[in-house]
């Protein structure tokens, strides 16, 4: 581990020198590339330096304790110093092991989220709306930007499906765990008998793909335009500004009608199409290797039930890690940190097991 950390520190110092080179400063591509690499190494290198400093202080204190030429008072001070430093050294070492775990190459990317009402009709569509609000509020808490891409509204104010983009550093690293089926248990407002109904909505979280990762030949894409519509199907725009893209080789279809400009809708739809194709390529690659990461939380299957939201008991349960929280209202208000942090820790523990 420490050999690897030493190599990373050398590379970090090399990058510092390169970023001070006028030739690099005048080349925007190299400057961006080296700055990004340096930023990725920053936390690990700074923690490694802190570890070396603390570890050295511990060794010096130990040496003083073992030095019989020193008086008892000095050796007692050295012992106290050791007792203070030992847990700090162990904690820093544990943190460094986590920082060296394999990184998901998509973790720093923006995401495209698709929420669909599944089993449960109108109630499932309303729940899809609740999930959309939950994710937008969570994004606000992270200072991320949310852009609505496409929405298929129901008359009661829910969504048959809604697609939106979240722009923010590390968005995929936190939201990737939301892939799967979400179940709700509650008494519908239209239910006079007070019976609890169970409905589901599915969530797909796709990392935004760059053009260099997925190149789409526009000859393979059919572009249709139509009039955008809002809740209840009413027209909200008299111009043909909404765009539907059909990728002929894969059969994937993407719509976008949120913007008033046809050009902007087409750009947004292309982002979704590129993300879906990237996701499809990744899935096919995983199947070919027949090795979806054992370290992943659950199977990542979008049909897998990952979480239950129980309204009568104000309870949220994540079935993958057996976590139950008695604060449903706060979770739906975007307070997802406790759940996401627990899922990240669980994934790290699995990766540590695989590395041993």
From Swiss-Prot:
GO molecular function: translation release factor activity, codon specific
Modifications the protein undergoes after translation, according to the UniProt entry: Methylated by PrmC. Methylation increases the termination efficiency of RF1.
InterPro entries: PCRF, Pep_chain_release_fac_I, Pep_chain_release_fac_I_sf, Prokaryotic/Mito_RF, RF-1
Keywords: Cytoplasm, Methylation, Protein biosynthesis
Modification type N5-methylglutamine: residues: 234
GO cellular component, one term: cytoplasm
Intracellular or extracellular location(s): Cytoplasm
Predominant subcellular localization, coarse grouping: cytoplasm
Family: Belongs to the prokaryotic/mitochondrial release factor family.
Role summary: Peptide chain release factor 1 directs the termination of translation in response to the peptide chain termination codons UAG and UAA.
Protein name: Peptide chain release factor 1
């Amino acid at each position: 581990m420490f050999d690897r950390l030493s190599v990373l520190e050398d590379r970090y110092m090399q990058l510092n020198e390169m970023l001070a080179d006028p030739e690099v400063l005048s080349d925007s591509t190299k400057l961006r590339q080296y700055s990004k690499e340096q930023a990725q190494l920053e936390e690990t290198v700074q923690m490694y330096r802190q570890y070396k400093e603390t570890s050295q202080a511990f060794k010096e204190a130990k040496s003083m304790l073992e030095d019989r030429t020193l008086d008892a008072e000095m050796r007692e001070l050295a012992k106290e110093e050791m007792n203070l430093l030992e847990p700090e050294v162990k904690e820093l070492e544990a943190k460094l092991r986590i920082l060296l775990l394999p990184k998901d190459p998509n973790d720093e990317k923006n995401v495209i989220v698709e929420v669909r009402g599944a089993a449960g009709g109108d109630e499932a569509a309303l729940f899809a709306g609740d999930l959309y609000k939950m994710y937008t509020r969570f994004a606000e808490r992270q200072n991320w930007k949310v852009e609505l891409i496409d929405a298929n509204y129901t008359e009661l104010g829910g969504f048959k499906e809604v697609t939106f983009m979240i722009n923010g550093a590390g968005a995929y690293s936190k939201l990737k765990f939301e892939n799967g089926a979400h179940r709700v248990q509650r008494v519908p407002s239209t239910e006079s008998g007070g019976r609890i109904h169970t409905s589901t909505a599915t969530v797909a979280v796709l990392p935004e793909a760059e053009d260099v990762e997925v190149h789409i030949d526009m000859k393979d894409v059919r572009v249709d335009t139509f009039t955008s519509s809002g809740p209840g199907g009413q027209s909200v725009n008299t111009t043909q500004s909404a765009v539907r893209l059909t990728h002929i080789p894969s059969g994937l279809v993407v719509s976008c009608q949120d913007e008033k400009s046809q050009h902007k809708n087409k750009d947004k739809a292309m982002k979704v199409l590129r993300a879906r194709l990237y996701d499809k390529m990744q899935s096919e690659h995983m199947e070919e290797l027949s090795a979806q990461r054992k370290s992943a939380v659950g199977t990542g299957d979008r049909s897998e039930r990952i979480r239950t939201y129980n309204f009568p008991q104000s309870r949220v349960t994540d079935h993958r890690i057996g976590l139950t929280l008695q604060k449903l209202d706060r979770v739906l208000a975007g307070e997802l940190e406790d759940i996401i942090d627990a899922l990240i820790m669980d994934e790290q523990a699995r990766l540590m097991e695989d590395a041993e």
